[in-house]
From Swiss-Prot:
Protein name: Small ribosomal subunit protein uS2
Organism expressing this protein natively: Helicobacter hepaticus (strain ATCC 51449 / 3B1)
PANTHER family membership: 30S RIBOSOMAL PROTEIN S2 PROKARYOTIC AND ORGANELLAR (PTHR12534), SMALL RIBOSOMAL SUBUNIT PROTEIN US2M (PTHR12534:SF0)
BP GO terms, sorted: translation
PROSITE patterns assigned to the protein according to its UniProt record, in alphabetical order: RIBOSOMAL_S2_1, RIBOSOMAL_S2_2
Similarity field: Belongs to the universal ribosomal protein uS2 family.
Amino acid sequence: MVTMKDLLECGVHFGHQTRRWNPKMKRFIFGVRKNIHIIDLQKTLRYFRYTYNIIKQAASEGKVIMFVGTKRQASETLKQYAESVNAPYVNYRWLGGMLTNFSTIKKSIRRLEIIEEMESSGQIDLLTKKEKLMLQRKKEKLDKYLGGVRHMKKAPDMIFVIDAAKEKIAVAEARRLGIPVVAPLDTNCDPDMVDYPIPGNDDAIRSIQLFCKEISEAILEGRSENKDEQNEQGEQIAPVTNEEKQEILDEVTAEVATQMQEEA
């Protein structure tokens, strides 16, 4: 579990410039140094350990925790730790409705599965060069946006967010559905929007790595206490039908025809 030494070494105590603060964060601020708010690490440590146990308990009950963090310095780290514990994640861009309209997201995930099946069966090689290229581009785009949630069968039970201010749409969707939100809170954040806050720097790479590492370890520790856990993410993909393939082929053919008309 996290220590005071970890927090100091990773710069978790450095907040934003004083002019960028949210007054609601006042209770978590220790002082000011060179116009930078310094976060009270005694409180950070207490909140961190409390939240660690909340995550651990949720994981021990078989609950699914989604990782969300799309900004540049968080994207790869978040993906790495989420994949290490087989957790769903969004690290490129949050699509509106990812939680509140999950049925539509599942349809897009299904399209990705269909295209991949067409690739593995060799059917994609029977298409024209333009059709094949267009289909591959569709696959790349779907994978970029939805690759991290493709095995998620329902909305998550909890979300862990890096930069709650930036990911305000994800946070708002979770709150609308009653899904608890866990997040480090920098001095520019609104603590009222987060169920389980951890006051701390959400911009520095080392700080982000520490948060992701600890949350991942809490998940693993919780799962180890649940020997009977049935992980929904291991479910088999439904067989792709010819009708599903044909629907995508018709769409690609129409798009290629439109493109050729525009080029003519």
